[in-house]
Amino acid sequence: MVWEVKTNQMPNAVQKLLLVMDKRASGMNDSLELLQCNENLPSSPGYNSCDEHMELDDLPELQAVQSDPTQSGMYQLSSDVSHQEYPRSSWNQNTSDIPETTYRENEVDWLTELANIATSPQSPLMQCSFYNRSSPVHIIATSKSLHSYARPPPVSSSSKSEPAFPHHHWKEETPVRHERANSESESGIFCMSSLSDDDDLGWCNSWPSTVWHCFLKGTRLCFHKGSNKEWQDVEDFARAEGCDNEEDLQMGIHKGYGSDGLKLLSHEESVSFGESVLKLTFDPGTVEDGLLTVECKLDHPFYVKNKGWSSFYPSLTVVQHGIPCCEVHIGDVRLPPGHLDAINFDDSGVFDTFKSYDFTPMDSSAVYVLSSMARQRRASLSCGGPGGQDFARSGFSKNCGSPGSSQLSSSSLYAKAVKNHSSGTVSATSPNKCKRPMNAFMLFAKKYRVEYTQMYPGKDNRAISVILGDRWKKMKNEERRMYTLEAKALAEEQKRLNPDCWKRKRTNSSSQQH
């Protein structure tokens, strides 16, 4: 068996492997059969057709491996399947009613969808550009597309439970041993990991290290009951409560405070030390302990009972911590690390598909990214065009209604388009029209519109918008900054997912001028 490597003389050239098989081992003839892979990847920058040979003498010695003829390949792809395309010819419009098991039999399933997207030029995993942590991250999604299955798999029941709060978490002098941002330099996916002795806890590797209960460093506490009712940093409180060993720790003043979780009673945004913060009030569930008010950062993640990761600003949280989150609501119960519900809870049906795999934090973040890309791609193609069939065969067509209703909606959209075209205007309900992302004020108004509507029951929506606009003008720059950052991140994500949307907008504007 002879191996020969042929490569192009250029930085990112695609290498071709020529495998020369010796048929004499199979008892046939002495002729040689040449098997060559000549797939030219269009996603490779600067590729040309140079076939210059380069002999490599420092290759390691290769040994032939006898394969078992009784074992069949786990994944088989037909000749018309590539790393970027679907076998479109094998599908038709009548496949939307085929159950999911049939798709698996045809070897086209959810994992195949992710594999095709992962190897496409648009995939962030295939891009070599390096992102700065302070710059807007391109991997972000709205709160509707966020899902908790991006979490690493829960700890198996066979693993032994450790104490909920190891003492080195309470010691400022003992730093976390290894803290890194997984895949930050390659794909821009930020997933902070804490690989310390408490990795066996319910806190997965992607969970940020807490100082006390569910609160991160930089949080300020104010207990409504007790000897000290003044504001104090969570680091100082943890250091005052912590002792030399676990037994002394149990004798702390607030021993077991909120051990079953902290229920959110109220929340508001304020400015503390020149920085916009969240002021949250929690109920520990016991009258004798009293309430707790905290001031935390806007992107602070919380693990909510029966809900998973949650945040007041999911877009900021996924940028800062790499944790996809749902939105926080009044009444949510925050769980501390090591809580039984935090270890065993999993609300994702899609996540069951991946339970048999041993995901690292980097892998789980990649799963979230690719899955989010797949959903966004299907959503953008579901309303019409040639991509509509892709959405119909994906198994998610149930969310779009029956075929009859789809045809009816398409007909109505077409009728509106013809009517608007005849009057010289551009249809705003075009099937390929992308929604413009919300700006900072729209995000602000969305958050407070319900509250102001309840405050002024006699006013209509337009009057409420005027009131919201007045409050927006009176806000300080640091108070507006959080909405500006979130709007900028959403705009970057919209540009990444739908680059043609912005071009089409400019084209429509120019056509209207003519």
UniProtKB/Swiss-Prot annotation:
Pfam families, alphabetized: AXH (PF08517), HMG_box (PF00505)
Q: Where is this region: Disordered?
A: 150-182
Q: Which domain of life is it from?
A: Eukaryota
Gene label: HBP1
Query: In this entry, which stretches build a coiled coil?
Result: none
Which molecular function terms from Gene Ontology are attached? DNA-binding transcription factor activity, RNA polymerase II-specific; RNA binding; RNA polymerase II cis-regulatory region sequence-specific DNA binding
Question: Which species is the source of this protein?
Answer: Pongo abelii (Sumatran orangutan)
Ubl conjugation found in the keyword field: yes
Q: Which residues bind DNA?
A: 434-502
Protein's job? Transcriptional repressor that binds to the promoter region of target genes. Plays a role in the regulation of the cell cycle and of the Wnt pathway. Binds preferentially to the sequence 5'-TTCATTCATTCA-3'. Binding to the histone H1.0 promoter is enhanced by interaction with RB1. Disrupts the interaction between DNA and TCF4.
What is the protein's given name? HMG box-containing protein 1
Q: Which GO terms describe its biological process?
A: Wnt signaling pathway
GO terms for cellular component: nucleus
